[in-house]
Amino acid sequence: MNHLKSPARSLAGLAATALIACALPGGALAQAEGGLYIAENRFSFERAAKQGLARNPPGQRFFVLALPPNTAALTQAASTSAATVRNQVVAAGGVLFVCQRDIDNGSIDPAQLVPGVVAVRGFPPRGSDAIPRGERYFPDENTANLPRKNRTLKRLRSACS
Protein backbone atom coordinates (compact mmCIF):
# COMPACT_ATOMS: atom_id res chain seq x y z
CA MET A 1 0.00 0.00 0.00
CA ASN A 2 1.39 3.40 -0.94
CA HIS A 3 1.40 5.85 1.99
CA LEU A 4 2.57 8.78 -0.10
CA LYS A 5 0.02 11.46 -0.75
CA SER A 6 -0.54 13.02 -4.11
CA PRO A 7 0.79 16.60 -4.51
CA ALA A 8 -2.77 17.91 -4.87
CA ARG A 9 -3.88 16.16 -1.68
CA SER A 10 -0.83 17.45 0.24
CA LEU A 11 -1.47 20.97 -1.03
CA ALA A 12 -5.12 20.79 0.04
CA GLY A 13 -4.12 19.60 3.51
CA LEU A 14 -1.52 22.35 3.78
CA ALA A 15 -4.06 24.97 2.71
CA ALA A 16 -6.58 23.71 5.28
CA THR A 17 -3.94 23.81 8.02
CA ALA A 18 -2.91 27.34 7.03
CA LEU A 19 -6.55 28.46 6.99
CA ILE A 20 -7.12 27.11 10.51
CA ALA A 21 -3.88 28.66 11.78
CA CYS A 22 -4.83 32.05 10.33
CA ALA A 23 -8.36 31.88 11.69
CA LEU A 24 -7.37 31.08 15.27
CA PRO A 25 -5.38 34.22 16.07
CA GLY A 26 -8.18 36.42 14.71
CA GLY A 27 -10.71 34.64 16.87
CA ALA A 28 -8.41 34.87 19.85
CA LEU A 29 -7.99 38.61 19.29
CA ALA A 30 -11.74 39.09 19.27
CA GLN A 31 -11.83 37.47 22.72
CA ALA A 32 -8.88 39.50 24.02
CA GLU A 33 -9.38 42.30 26.47
CA GLY A 34 -7.02 45.16 27.15
CA GLY A 35 -6.02 46.82 30.37
CA LEU A 36 -7.22 49.57 32.66
CA TYR A 37 -5.79 53.09 32.35
CA ILE A 38 -6.47 55.45 35.24
CA ALA A 39 -6.56 59.25 34.92
CA GLU A 40 -5.66 60.52 38.38
CA ASN A 41 -3.71 63.36 39.99
CA ARG A 42 -0.41 62.64 38.22
CA PHE A 43 -1.83 61.17 35.04
CA SER A 44 -4.22 63.29 32.93
CA PHE A 45 -7.23 61.86 31.13
CA GLU A 46 -5.66 62.56 27.75
CA ARG A 47 -2.43 60.80 28.74
CA ALA A 48 -4.26 57.75 30.16
CA ALA A 49 -6.55 57.57 27.12
CA LYS A 50 -3.68 57.89 24.63
CA GLN A 51 -1.80 55.15 26.45
CA GLY A 52 -4.86 52.90 26.15
CA LEU A 53 -5.20 53.71 22.46
CA ALA A 54 -1.51 52.98 21.83
CA ARG A 55 -1.47 49.67 23.68
CA ASN A 56 -4.67 48.13 22.33
CA PRO A 57 -5.48 47.28 18.71
CA PRO A 58 -8.69 48.81 17.33
CA GLY A 59 -11.70 46.76 18.37
CA GLN A 60 -10.03 45.30 21.47
CA ARG A 61 -11.93 46.42 24.52
CA PHE A 62 -9.96 48.39 27.10
CA PHE A 63 -10.92 50.62 30.01
CA VAL A 64 -10.26 54.23 31.04
CA LEU A 65 -11.22 55.35 34.55
CA ALA A 66 -11.29 59.09 35.23
CA LEU A 67 -10.93 60.25 38.83
CA PRO A 68 -11.40 63.87 39.92
CA PRO A 69 -10.10 66.31 38.76
CA ASN A 70 -9.82 64.47 35.42
CA THR A 71 -13.53 63.71 35.09
CA ALA A 72 -14.20 66.95 33.19
CA ALA A 73 -13.03 65.13 30.06
CA LEU A 74 -16.10 62.89 30.32
CA THR A 75 -18.59 65.73 30.55
CA GLN A 76 -20.37 67.90 28.03
CA ALA A 77 -18.05 70.75 29.12
CA ALA A 78 -14.86 68.92 28.06
CA SER A 79 -12.24 70.85 26.13
CA THR A 80 -12.12 70.19 22.40
CA SER A 81 -8.88 68.20 22.71
CA ALA A 82 -10.22 66.09 25.60
CA ALA A 83 -13.49 65.42 23.75
CA THR A 84 -11.54 64.36 20.65
CA VAL A 85 -9.44 61.86 22.60
CA ARG A 86 -12.54 60.64 24.49
CA ASN A 87 -14.32 60.00 21.18
CA GLN A 88 -11.25 58.17 19.83
CA VAL A 89 -11.30 55.88 22.86
CA VAL A 90 -14.96 55.00 22.34
CA ALA A 91 -14.47 54.50 18.58
CA ALA A 92 -11.55 52.13 19.28
CA GLY A 93 -13.61 49.97 21.65
CA GLY A 94 -12.69 51.61 24.94
CA VAL A 95 -15.08 51.83 27.89
CA LEU A 96 -15.14 55.03 29.98
CA PHE A 97 -15.62 54.85 33.75
CA VAL A 98 -16.13 57.15 36.70
CA CYS A 99 -16.51 56.00 40.30
CA GLN A 100 -20.00 55.83 41.75
CA ARG A 101 -18.58 57.17 45.03
CA ASP A 102 -17.59 60.40 43.21
CA ILE A 103 -21.17 60.82 42.04
CA ASP A 104 -22.48 60.00 45.52
CA ASN A 105 -20.20 62.55 47.23
CA GLY A 106 -21.04 65.31 44.71
CA SER A 107 -17.64 65.45 42.98
CA ILE A 108 -19.32 64.52 39.69
CA ASP A 109 -22.70 65.69 38.40
CA PRO A 110 -24.10 62.67 36.52
CA ALA A 111 -26.32 64.95 34.42
CA GLN A 112 -23.16 66.45 32.89
CA LEU A 113 -21.59 63.13 31.84
CA VAL A 114 -21.68 62.28 28.15
CA PRO A 115 -23.73 59.23 27.15
CA GLY A 116 -21.93 55.92 27.55
CA VAL A 117 -19.89 56.77 30.65
CA VAL A 118 -20.30 53.98 33.19
CA ALA A 119 -20.35 54.60 36.95
CA VAL A 120 -18.66 51.71 38.74
CA ARG A 121 -18.77 50.81 42.41
CA GLY A 122 -15.77 49.94 44.54
CA PHE A 123 -15.56 46.92 46.80
CA PRO A 124 -18.33 46.67 49.39
CA PRO A 125 -17.31 46.89 53.06
CA ARG A 126 -15.78 43.76 54.57
CA GLY A 127 -18.51 41.40 55.75
CA SER A 128 -21.11 42.83 53.36
CA ASP A 129 -23.17 40.51 51.20
CA ALA A 130 -23.66 43.15 48.48
CA ILE A 131 -21.67 40.93 46.11
CA PRO A 132 -22.89 37.36 46.63
CA ARG A 133 -20.25 34.92 47.86
CA GLY A 134 -18.33 33.41 44.96
CA GLU A 135 -19.45 36.15 42.55
CA ARG A 136 -17.44 39.06 41.10
CA TYR A 137 -20.23 41.49 40.30
CA PHE A 138 -23.02 43.26 42.15
CA PRO A 139 -26.37 41.63 41.23
CA ASP A 140 -27.67 44.78 39.48
CA GLU A 141 -24.50 45.55 37.49
CA ASN A 142 -24.43 45.29 33.71
CA THR A 143 -21.49 42.90 33.44
CA ALA A 144 -21.17 43.61 29.71
CA ASN A 145 -19.65 46.99 30.63
CA LEU A 146 -17.12 45.64 33.11
CA PRO A 147 -13.80 43.82 32.72
CA ARG A 148 -13.87 40.05 32.48
CA LYS A 149 -10.29 39.71 33.71
CA ASN A 150 -10.21 39.32 37.47
CA ARG A 151 -7.05 41.41 37.88
CA THR A 152 -8.48 44.32 35.88
CA LEU A 153 -11.80 44.22 37.73
CA LYS A 154 -9.98 44.22 41.09
CA ARG A 155 -7.87 47.24 40.07
CA LEU A 156 -11.02 49.06 38.98
CA ARG A 157 -12.91 48.30 42.18
CA SER A 158 -9.87 49.19 44.32
CA ALA A 159 -9.53 52.57 42.62
CA CYS A 160 -13.21 53.27 43.34
CA SER A 161 -13.21 52.07 46.96
Name each model-derived stretch:
Residues 115-161:
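C-terminal partner/receptor-binding element of secreted or periplasmic proteins
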